[in-house]
């Protein structure tokens, strides 16, 4: 049985860094992916699926949802780790629904929790615009990314809240505090459901 944790949060919430630190520390047990990594990995493998993904990316198009879902499913099922953390997913109501369907069709994957790293828009803006992460980190791009994140957020929160899967973590603290909080939650969940 694969145990899946999803981490969502605004741009600049630190969700990727948090997940990376936890997965490194427990590398015998936990694998961490971001959706972008998974797609790039598939392209690198040179599989037919990878070739399809590359054709969309090369043309600057969004990779269709069913292809993203196939990629995620393959990564989870083929991972040699029991626990999988995926950050930055789901980003939309469509992705959330597609994931739910995929989980129903694959009883060997169990969604343990959706962890939301909560930060204010001010904090997120400060972190993103204050860090040199590449050309797209300017104000307009940040505002667009923030808007894309916030638009479906209530529906996503509600959906997982109803299932008793949503865990909010305060992202305004130091990285050490956030990681400690997230790590103990994940390990406790794994133990509970061992």
Swiss-Prot record:
SUPFAM superfamilies: P-loop containing nucleoside triphosphate hydrolases. AMP binds at residues 35, 40, 61-63, 88-91, 95, 133, 145. Its EC number is 2.7.4.3. Keywords: ATP-binding, Cytoplasm, Kinase, Nucleotide biosynthesis, Nucleotide-binding, Transferase. GO terms for biological process: AMP salvage. InterPro entries: Adenylat/UMP-CMP_kin, Adenylat_kinase_CS, P-loop_NTPase. Its main location: cytoplasm. One of its GO terms (molecular function) is ATP binding. Residues 34-63 are annotated as: NMP. Belongs to the adenylate kinase family. Catalyzes the reversible transfer of the terminal phosphate group between ATP and AMP. Plays an important role in cellular energy homeostasis and in adenine nucleotide metabolism. Consists of three domains, a large central CORE domain and two small peripheral domains, NMPbind and LID, which undergo movements during catalysis. The LID domain closes over the site of phosphoryl transfer upon ATP binding. Assembling and dissambling the active center during each catalytic cycle provides an effective means to prevent ATP hydrolysis. Monomer. This is Adenylate kinase. It comes from Nitratiruptor sp. (strain SB155-2).
